Amino acid sequence: MAVFLLATSTIMFPTKIEAADCNGACSPFEVPPCRSSDCRCVPIGLFVGFCIHPTGLSSVAKMVDEHPNLCQSDDECMKKGSGNFCARYPNNYIDYGWCFDSDSEALKGFLAMPRATTK
């Protein structure tokens, strides 16, 4: 009887599932990004970005192509003329990196940053 009442109560009173709020500024080093694992942080600078919902990933791919420093490979950095090394963000929610010259001090500082950890 109790199981029947529990089952019928979920049918009669469905719970509303809230969509993640994927707005505002974020850091590509923040895990999870934008305070939700349902969102992604798209860098617009080395340490700052904006939150999006993954349904907008086609626009993100276009933005990565057009941004001079966002990359997915060393070759892409060389094609864009932004460096010769694509340093990946230490965040498994971000599928791209930032272009650097392989002998630059900025790259050494970027690589010295602590790796983000998932909880």
UniProtKB/Swiss-Prot annotation:
Annotated signal sequence range: 1-19
Residue ranges of the propeptide: 57-64, 118-119
Alphabetic keyword roster: Disulfide bond, Knottin, Seed storage protein, Signal, Storage protein, Toxin
Disulphide bridges, residue numbers: 22-39, 26-41, 34-51
PTM statement from Swiss-Prot or TrEMBL: The C-terminal glycine may be removed from A1b.
Record has ATP-binding as a keyword: no
GO molecular function, one term: toxin activity
UniProt entry tagged with the keyword Signal: yes
Superkingdom of this protein's organism: Eukaryota
Entry's free-text remark on domains: The presence of a 'disulfide through disulfide knot' structurally defines this protein as a knottin.
Annotated protein name in UniProt: Albumin-1
Organism: Glycine soja (Wild soybean)
